[in-house]
Amino acid sequence: MRITTVILIVKLENCGKFRMGHSKADKAANHDRIVQAAAARFREAGVEGIGVADLMKDAGLTHGGFYRHFASRDDLVTEAIERALREGSRAVAAVATIKECPLNALVDAYLSTAHRDDVVTSCAVTTLAADVARSNDRARSAYTRQVGEYLALLTRLIAGDKQKSRRTKAIAALSTLVGAVSMARAVNDDKLSREILQSAADELKARFG
């Protein structure tokens, strides 16, 4: 076998390996785009508010490619819920790093009209609660873990000496945060919506700040 033939074979093999690696990278990137699009749209329209075809279109992909990434729509729903929860967690944790009155800063950010109105990137603990309640165990477990992380964070931020007492207050605070935003979004009276947010914020800061 001539040297040039050997070189050609090696080049072809390397080219095939490159294409294979490139294909895997493309598939992973496309998978991520689908999950990201779903995480945003599910928060905006609800899990049942948008179909696979529209989600794939949002991701810039064809409907026919969906099942190369997911065995079922439920698999996508679960991954998207997990993604949305992680994104919300990072945002809340970032606010809580403010050195001066971190609890008050978190309350103000969570109960702001900006958070109320920005459903697409908002905290999924509030936005997807009803959807998760009707979802599978994996999604509910992810939601439960996120609630646990928020409670741990609030327990650290709330003043007091006794761990049990601070955890009880943390549960009350988180329930108020989630409930106030949900109600503020649901009413069609902007003045009342703002009153709900402000009253909840004032009460939380007075009790726990």
Regions found by a protein language model. Give the residues of each.
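Short, intrinsically disordered or compositionally biased N-terminal tails of bacterial proteins
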Residues: M1-H22
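Helix-turn-helix
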Residues: R33, A37, R41-D75, E79
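Hydrophobic alpha-helical connector segments
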Residues: E79, A93-S122
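Short, basic, alpha-helical segments at the C-terminal edge of helix-turn-helix-like DNA-binding modules
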Residues: E82-E87
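Amphipathic alpha-helical segments used for helix-helix packing
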Residues: L103-L106, D117-T144
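Short alpha-helical scaffolding segments that buttress acidic/His motifs in well-ordered protein cores
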Residues: Y110, V125-A129, A173-L177
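Hydrophobic/aromatic-rich alpha-helical bundle segments in the mid-to-C-terminal region
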Residues: D137-R145, I158-G209
